[in-house]
Amino acid sequence: MVFQNVALDSHEKIVFCNDDKTGLRAIIAIHSTALGPAAGGCRLWSYQSEEEALFDVLKLSKAMSYKNAMAGLNFGGGKAVIIKTEDFSNADEIYEKFGEFVDQFNGSYITAEDVGMTMRIMQLIARNTRHVTGLPKEGSDAGGDPSPKTSWGILKGIEAAVRFKLGKSELDGLTIAVQGVGNVGYHLCKYLSKVGVNILVADIDDNRVKRVIKEFNVTAIDYEDILYQKVDVLSPCALGSILNKQSIPRLKTEIIAGGANNQLESDQDGRRLFERGILYAPDYVINGGGIINVAAEYYGDADDDQVIKKVSAIGPRLNNIFKEAERLK
């Protein structure tokens, strides 16, 4: 088992977790522990190279520092990625070994569920560390799959953005495009379908699209085209870097408010959206519901109802951000 520590960028610690016996290849990045232990999910993805995985985990962990701070949590920013290889037949052993690596941080990194992960995987990780969340909850306790809370926060953020930009107090009759209908996108469609929204969806996984078509009144769009539909709100809930100098000129929306991390490919892309008059809800604010749930589960200081109340505050928080941005422009 190799535990290699390197220093890069402004991060406090980057650890390459390699284990020849199981085949585990993972990276854990701690961006900051200024506000508390670094907390952030673990992503399972088929990266083309270790360099690609490193680039991803560095951006994601830095974003977690902002997300946790904006949510008012006593957490710093961290993230982990597990590189999924072609031969992943011993996945359970890999997840358990990853738990050993997490435990070696002695609580300075707390892991959670992210893209590609499930509650069952988190339970396997928890066999070797207590510094893990997203475990099955009991009764009214906080915990479990964090994605419904993430989606609830996105809904509250969309409502705030619609009030600010469109002057509408209800979402009924609006058209919203949801890119990505995995855990977060699925629950967002569930919430939106209850308030009379016309929902367009797309995902690289056809089975996910079939699921939301079966359960909700949605319209499927080709994945390559979903960003460029004429809609009131675009809600990216897949992977990041989709807002860039190529895509932004083609957008036909007034609002972008979604759950994907690192939606802007570069800082300049925020300026490009501003120049086009598109209101952008910062991803590290609007998608903070999941980490709020993680904090309540880890510290045991809030039940499920209290978590919902805290997550609902994302709407007013974004409204204040929109007002301040308007004042400073």
Q: Where on the chain are the PLM-derived regions?
A:
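Conserved active-site and cofactor/substrate-binding residues in soluble primary-metabolism enzymes
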Residues: 48-56, 89-93, 97, 116-120, ...
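Buried hydrophobic packing segments
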Residues: 57-60, 154-162, 291-295
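Adenosine-phosphate binding glycine-rich loop
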Residues: 162, 254-329
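Flexible, glycine/charged-enriched surface loops at secondary-structure junctions
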Residues: 68-73, 108-113, 166-175, 223, ...
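Glycine-rich phosphate/diphosphate-binding loop of Rossmann-like nucleotide-binding domains
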Residues: 141, 145-233
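N-terminal ligand-binding/catalytic initiation module
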Residues: 1-140
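Rossmann-like adenosine-cofactor binding region
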Residues: 173, 206-281, 285
